Amino acid sequence: MHDITDLPAWERLFKKIVWKQLGDMEGKKILDFGSGEGITANHFAEKNDVTAIEPSKEMLSNAWKDYEYTQIVGDVNALSAFKNETFDMIICHNVLEYIDDKAAVVKALARVLKKDGIISIVKHNRAGRVMQMAVLLDDFEKANEILDGKDSTASKFGTIRYYEDNDITKWEPQITVSDILGIRTFWDLQQNQQKHGDEAWQEKMLQLELRVSQMQE
């Protein structure tokens, strides 16, 4: 049985924040598109009917599957197997940045989402990346490039192609943005690695992150 404490501290905090924001779900049909190692799919599969789609066989070799869920190896084309309005909830976390045709993916996801369903999209924050480059990495050249609208990179996944929140509704007008929440606002600013490993500190940080995640400014 996998446990969230098996994850690096930063990822553990990320998952806890996102799961808390999504809320407790039971008896729902959920799609995790770009499911990676299946950590979130596995979490919600305890009480829900979950389908996970992931193109990387390498990531799936380490998949968490303590609870039963359907795993599909594939990409957006795999969605053609599902009828319109199949899912109550669609999870698409840190995925669209790495896709060339974002509009096609968003439209395909919207098709299989129920009329009263919810799609949870987690995206990279351009301003946060600029702060990371300027404050933490002392890379002013890269910070300015990102401010100028250029792409960035992630060591594990490649080029990060940033997009804005309102792009989502431009790609698919049937989707409306009901809420915008923050994730991991403060964590990376603490550079003391010993602090990161302190469970009491982690809990205090989690509560603070959750508190500010709903603030609009």
PLM segments and residue spans:
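Class I SAM-dependent methyltransferase SAM/SAH-binding core
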Residues: 37-78
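A short acidic, Gly/Pro-enriched loop at the edge of an enzyme's catalytic core
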Residues: 81-89
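A short SAM/SAH-binding and catalytic strip from SAM-dependent methyltransferases
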Residues: 89-101
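Short alpha-helix
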Residues: 157-175, 180
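A short glycine-rich, Lys/Arg-flanked "PGG" loop and its adjoining helix->strand segment in the class I
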Residues: 103-118
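Conserved class I S-adenosyl-L-methionine
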Residues: 1-26, 39-43, 59-62, 118-146
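A C-terminal cap/extension of S-adenosyl-L-methionine-dependent methyltransferases
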Residues: 170, 179-217
